[in-house]
Amino acid sequence: MKNNQSKIKLVIDVGNSYLKIGVFHDLELIELKKFKTKYFKISYFENFYKKVFAKYKFNLFIVFGSVVPSIEQKFLDFVKENNLENNFFLINNYLKLSFKVPQEKLGLIGNDLLGAMEYASKETSNALIFLFGTASVALLLEKLNFSGAIIAPGMNFSFNNLLSKAKKLKGFKLHKENVSLWNLNTQDALESGYENLKNGFIKQIICKSNSNYPVYISGGDISNLSPEISHQFVDNIVLKGYLLIYLKNC
């Protein structure tokens, strides 16, 4: 691992909803591929791997992080079958990080949360980090310590579940544009509900945290985020954090 000279890294983030593969040249994300996790087959990755290898003519190094054990095992089998052990790095709770995790919590924290925290800790000692995906997550970084998390059902997941159970809402899609607070029809009322859930989740946590820490947001749709919320949007923060964890340990 220490002698790996490949400039091209395939960084893989396996989440509950999506599996993302980022192609990085040094620290720059130059290509992104995304699959729905529930339908993923290892042959999809094998084909993508071959295409990237043919395109960039570099030995490829794989950085892998997952919150789905069954998918992780498929990749471990692929690596073993193709003799790629020396070009593979597995994210876990026991690696060197740029922030501290309580000893008693090691092994209990999702790898995706570690990735997001690593990214933020490279920029600041204190931060509030919000991740919007299958779950809505808030993370607290204080003095380069992982101080806690809040996890709620993901908003897209919750709304899709609502829509699936309401017969009159079949085919409805959230547009999330120019949303008024109060509305007189179901579609606009749902749009408002979605936006207020999102803004309320963020604003309430910032308020209760009683801090002026920098706010990082990743995932989901933030097109109508309240202008009162000063924040930095970081696309694919987990992928970028996984790469930083690898670089700290190589």
From Swiss-Prot:
Catalytic center residues: 112
Main location as per UniProt: cytoplasm
Q: Supply one GO CC term from the record.
A: cytoplasm
**Residues reported in the UniProt entry to bind ATP:** 13-20, 134
What's one Pfam family here? Pan_kinase
What EC number(s) does its UniProt record assign? Answer: 2.7.1.33
Q: Which UniProt keywords apply?
A: ATP-binding, Coenzyme A biosynthesis, Cytoplasm, Kinase, Nucleotide-binding, Potassium, Transferase
Q: What is one GO biological process annotated to this record?
A: coenzyme A biosynthetic process
Metabolic or biological pathway: Cofactor biosynthesis; coenzyme A biosynthesis; CoA from (R)-pantothenate: step 1/5
Binding residues for substrate: 110-113, 186
Q: Which SUPFAM superfamilies match?
A: Actin-like ATPase domain
Q: Which reaction does it catalyse?
A: (R)-pantothenate + ATP = (R)-4'-phosphopantothenate + ADP + H(+)
Q: How is the cofactor bound?
A: A monovalent cation. Ammonium or potassium.
**Which cofactor does this sequence's record say it needs?**
NH4(+); K(+)
A GO molecular function for this record?
Answer: pantothenate kinase activity
Where in or outside the cell is it found? Cytoplasm
* PANTHER family found in the cross-reference section: TYPE III PANTOTHENATE KINASE
Q: Which NCBIfam families match?
A: baf
Q: How does it assemble?
A: Homodimer.
Q: What does this protein do?
A: Catalyzes the phosphorylation of pantothenate (Pan), the first step in CoA biosynthesis.
Homology family: Belongs to the type III pantothenate kinase family.
Q: What is this protein called?
A: Type III pantothenate kinase
**Native source organism of the sequence:** Mycoplasmopsis synoviae (strain 53)
